[in-house]
Amino acid sequence: MIQRQFTVYGCVQGVGFRFFTAREANKLGIQGYVKNQADGSVRVVAAGSDRQVAAFRDWLEQGPPTAEVTNLLEQEYTGGRVFSDFTIER
């Protein structure tokens, strides 16, 4: 299992991005969370197999139809949390 952190930029707040992201994560079997950031971006932490996280990354690059993703940054997640499901954090 790998853990990755993504920061999604663009028109990604106020458009249902967190809801759709959680739905896609559950569909793919991803664990972790999604959370709005003060700068207008969205942070996503994803835990799963290489294949699951790669498919999730591909989805995040596009986002849901209601959003406009302009940039996606990816880095190793070093937060130390262990996830058992995927949640929307406030």
Swiss-Prot record:
Catalysed reaction per UniProt? Answer: an acyl phosphate + H2O = a carboxylate + phosphate + H(+)
Instruction: List, for all copies, the residue spans of the domain called Acylphosphatase-like.
Output: 3-90
Q: Which GO terms describe its molecular function?
A: acylphosphatase activity
Q: Which Gene3D superfamilies match?
A: 3.30.70.100
Organism superkingdom:
Bacteria
User: What positions constitute the catalytic site?
Assistant: 18, 36
Q: What is this protein called?
A: Acylphosphatase
Give me the gene this protein comes from: acyP
